[in-house]
Amino acid sequence: MRLPYSWLREVVAVGASGWDVTPGELEQTLLRIGHEVEEVIPLGPVDGPVTVGRVADIEELTGYKKPIRACAVDIGDRQYREIICGATNFAVGDLVVVALPGATLPGGFTISARKAYGRNSDGMICSAAELNLGADHSGILVLPPGAAEPGADGAGVLGLDDVVFHLAITPDRGYCMSVRGLARELACAYDLDFVDPASNSRVPPLPIEGPAWPLTVQPETGVRRFALRPVIGIDPAAVSPWWLQRRLLLCGIRATCPAVDVTNYVMLELGHPMHAHDRNRISGTLGVRFARSGETAVTLDGIERKLDTADVLIVDDAATAAIGGVMGAASTEVRADSTDVLLEAAIWDPAAVSRTQRRLHLPSEAARRYERTVDPAISVAALDRCARLLADIAGGEVSPTLTDWRGDPPCDDWSPPPIRMGVDVPDRIAGVAYPQGTTARRLAQIGAVVTHDGDTLTVTPPSWRPDLRQPADLVEEVLRLEGLEVIPSVLPPAPAGRGLTAGQQRRRTIGRSLALSGYVEILPTPFLPAGVFDLWGLEADDSRRMTTRVLNPLEADRPQLATTLLPALLEALVRNVSRGLVDVALFAIAQVVQPTEQTRGVGLIPVDRRPTDDEIAMLDASLPRQPQHVAAVLAGLREPRGPWGPGRPVEAADAFEAVRIIARASRVDVTLRPAQYLPWHPGRCAQVFVGESSVGHAGQLHPAVIERSGLPKGTCAVELNLDAIPCSAPLPAPRVSPYPAVFQDVSLVVAADIPAQAVADAVRAGAGDLLEDIALFDVFTGPQIGEHRKSLTFALRFRAPDRTLTEDDASAARDAAVQSAAERVGAVLRG
């Protein structure tokens, strides 16, 4: 949000005459009380002659690819300057800002007289962006009539000695998206009296003699308040004054017409969005309801938008008048000939506004405020302020009628529920002995009503602070306003014996091992892409299709929480490949969400007491399983090309090796068995077992899945359930034999469908305790071996703990291993 320093200072000074601080000090104060200042933008600076001019004549120059105009500009005392300009948004008689030769504009751009398009250009007519007044550079800055006389100092008229603060307002502090809210914060920070610009003393109530317009509201829409007031007989030719246009411009809003400008101005001033309808274009009764299936509406930007049944609308008897809290509709738009206006101020459901504006891709200043909640107590005050301002600017008469729907039954007290808190709670939490009365004083400053009952405070938060719900929220306010810098920095003692759990240690070890093996870790999104399981071809009853839906998702097309990590990894793989990174190895360690038959939604439990054991048991039973998974994907070359050769493409064996890396890091033994499990290739997929428990799958992905998902050919993947892998106890240090090892190789021919792991297990069982290690280093197939046969060559390492082995000892163990393999898997020693 952007706000000018001069406007903030003016509102704060109403309650503290003479108050004045520098913009730099104000920036530090805002940061100190918890508001992030993204940027401080000084207007200008300009150096040299910048003046106000009136366009006396315009000559259109032809023969060029774009519009070019030679303008005669009166800069005072009938001094005319010819200036060449490419903008077309001004006419003869308009007041403009002219930078004369010798002037230096923001960015160090110096103006000089020059020849352009065959004419002499003696200066430049400036846009708002060129003067650092805003980002709009689509046309030059046109001042409203009466803003100044030709020859007046441009810097003074524009107020270029001002500063604009660009703040990032957090979602829980919607009240600060206004001058009213930020001025109150500054008054608290400086211990000043604050005069609320929405109070009766500043906005005297207008008379009410009857309802302004017939209205019906569907209670289920979540609307809390809906107010209407007409302004009759405004001048369609009226223009907003420069002081108002300037403030809108500095806040990033373009001025259009008085009816729209005053609603935007009051929104910035008081924080309450409003909308202006053309009263003469409304047909019959206004109503608030949900959109119907298939219904559409043409919004103010001229686009017809398809609505959802969750969208809340303002409608009349003929058409949609607005999408509630998001944008008005074209049917009741205020136009150039509008004379009667119906002003509307409503309080919409924040979740509904957020959902609608995201789905329609219609972010707006009003929606940003409604998402963060708006003060319902000032709806009529904001409406009266807007109506009075519009009548002052554009003439007309404020109708003495008002429609103010406040729910059924009507609500008269908009304050959140009161909170009880011990007076010393902030002191105990902060470890600071605040002066007596500090807590009550600070809470009163933020607008709360505070009453004492011995050592207990009863605090009723103000209507604009729905975020204050429990004592901890009140403590935060006291600590923030007193200054976080006074809280002592004390490092909490770490109790002996505490540290990472076995599961945390294992996850770190696995991540480190995969990273050292060439994998790059990503943080996966917890949501499933739409239709991913259809791309994989999963059966309708596949357990991975049983997902948990989020009611208010970050993305409308991704409401389901992930039951597997692979979709997120495969999306990251596709993005990397599309950007030229074709040799990719990624992994992720994260939770997945797997609902059960008992998973269900439960109501909120009150936070003012400890939950009962039954309530805790109910909550635990309602939660879905959330096991930790580890997953990896590989594509491209696993071994890079170079002088040694063309490189080795990724294959299923690399996925199996990733399983072994994870197993070694987990200190468990795994067994790989052939399996058929989508999205893996049925002939190149292994099911991973620890003991007799299945913990996941690995291998090459199915060619059809690869093609439909746009993945590189031969993509491989692994996914294991870490929670299904037991955390082993710390391994004792092994006894290291001081005797040398004996190395021998053995080649065994087996049927092509026999897993290499089964052969290795048979060899290990036959060789006995002398076999220290076995490693497969060659697989050979060909006519020499026979059809449907393969040759597996293993490197064997023998060692005894108590003596030096002879070749005969090793050969005997090797022969026993061959015999065992022959008996178990039908292996034949290759000659």
UniProtKB/Swiss-Prot annotation:
It is found in: Cytoplasm. One of its GO terms (biological process) is phenylalanyl-tRNA aminoacylation. Keywords: Aminoacyl-tRNA synthetase, ATP-binding, Cytoplasm, Ligase, Magnesium, Metal-binding, Nucleotide-binding, Protein biosynthesis, RNA-binding, tRNA-binding. Its main location: cytoplasm. Its cofactor is Mg(2+). Residues 414-489 form the B5 domain. It holds the Pfam family B5. Residues 737-830 form the FDX-ACB domain. Binds 2 magnesium ions per tetramer. GO terms for molecular function: ATP binding; magnesium ion binding; phenylalanine-tRNA ligase activity; tRNA binding. It catalyses: tRNA(Phe) + L-phenylalanine + ATP = L-phenylalanyl-tRNA(Phe) + AMP + diphosphate + H(+). Mg(2+) binds at residues 467, 473, 476-477. It is an enzyme of class 6 (ligase). Residues 44-155 form the tRNA-binding domain. GO terms for cellular component: peptidoglycan-based cell wall; phenylalanine-tRNA ligase complex; plasma membrane. Was identified as a high-confidence drug target. Belongs to the phenylalanyl-tRNA synthetase beta subunit family. Type 1 subfamily. Tetramer of two alpha and two beta subunits. PANTHER family: PHENYLALANINE--TRNA LIGASE BETA SUBUNIT, PHENYLALANYL-TRNA SYNTHETASE BETA CHAIN AND LEUCINE-RICH REPEAT-CONTAINING PROTEIN 47. This is Phenylalanine--tRNA ligase beta subunit. The gene is pheT.
